[in-house]
Amino acid sequence: MGTYLALSGPAFETPAEISTFSKLGADAVGMSTVPEAMVANALGLKVGAVSCISNLAAGKSAHPLSHEEVAETASKALPKMTKLLANLLPKL
């Protein structure tokens, strides 16, 4: 559990932004989850969220950020996320 800071994207954050967000208490930064949750809420749906942290923030890794890294990590996480949601949803 932690604090998720949502941005509109579509660009990765800069190291300066990450530093500021960290000082503000953000544990994770992302471009998805919140917009989808807002639309679902506006439609009257109950909303919950589970996120996959797909990459280290700008300035936190030895290599530059890339969409390929995000996609690869998401693919690797898919089986575990599927299992988690399959077990969780019947309990809601």
Where are these predicted regions, by residue range?
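Glycine-rich phosphate- or other oxyanion-binding loops that anchor nucleotides, phosphorylated ligands
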Residues: 1-52, 56-62, 67-92
